[in-house]
Amino acid sequence: MPVADTSQLISGVAERYASSLFELALDAGSIEAVGADLTRIQALIDGSDDLKRLIVSPVFSADDQFKAISALVEKFGFSGLVGNFLKVVARNRRLFVLPGIIKAFRLLAARHKGEITADVTSAHALTLAQEIELKAALKGVTGKDVAVNVTVDPSILGGLIVKVGSRQIDTSLRTKLSTLKLALKEVG
């Protein structure tokens, strides 16, 4: 199966799971709480190589994944809805799409609130003050409330890459250095 087809398949699975979770959260009136739990889960995934391995590796059995996720749910006190959802995802051997589910849920929640979403890549985690300032700047440009999905990528060295819809603003140090390198090649 070509890579494009695989990513579309994963995206479709993630969107279906996210849609189901969103509908359950909407019925329970807990979209904000579920979103907060999903943000905590993403932070756990981003901060733990072992958890990343558990999620993506086909070596772990469904039972091993279920036990690990159940322990995680207990340890971090995820709500009943999110806890049960994670267990279902683990039992169905779909943990590998969990980051996609989280992203799709955020998009659904933002759309429900009339927000637009910006994907932001930063060399380091943003502080709460930086995130608030970024949201305010993006609201000034777009005229709408903006939810931000921050991804940390140390390889950009510094600055930000911001994607809002089809627009991208790249102020990363890596890009600036690449541009300077090209300019120097043209001069010499």
UniProtKB/Swiss-Prot annotation:
Q: Which UniProt keywords apply?
A: ATP synthesis, Cell inner membrane, Cell membrane, CF(1), Hydrogen ion transport, Ion transport, Membrane, Transport
| Protein topology in the membrane | Peripheral membrane protein
GO CC list? plasma membrane; proton-transporting ATP synthase complex
Q: Where in the cell is it found?
A: Cell inner membrane
| InterPro entries, per database record | ATP_synth_OSCP/delta_N_sf, ATPase_OSCP/d_CS, ATPase_OSCP/dsu
Q: Which GO terms describe its molecular function?
A: proton-transporting ATP synthase activity, rotational mechanism
The record's listing under SUPFAM superfamilies reads:
N-terminal domain of the delta subunit of the F1F0-ATP synthase
Q: Which Pfam families match?
A: OSCP
Assembly notes: F-type ATPases have 2 components, F(1) - the catalytic core - and F(0) - the membrane proton channel. F(1) has five subunits: alpha(3), beta(3), gamma(1), delta(1), epsilon(1). F(0) has three main subunits: a(1), b(2) and c(10-14). The alpha and beta chains form an alternating ring which encloses part of the gamma chain. F(1) is attached to F(0) by a central stalk formed by the gamma and epsilon chains, while a peripheral stalk is formed by the delta and b chains.
**What function does this protein fulfil?**
F(1)F(0) ATP synthase produces ATP from ADP in the presence of a proton or sodium gradient. F-type ATPases consist of two structural domains, F(1) containing the extramembraneous catalytic core and F(0) containing the membrane proton channel, linked together by a central stalk and a peripheral stalk. During catalysis, ATP synthesis in the catalytic domain of F(1) is coupled via a rotary mechanism of the central stalk subunits to proton translocation.
**Which protein family is named in the record?**
Belongs to the ATPase delta chain family.
Its protein name is ATP synthase subunit delta
Annotated organism of origin: Rhizobium meliloti (strain 1021)
> Gene that codes for this?
atpH
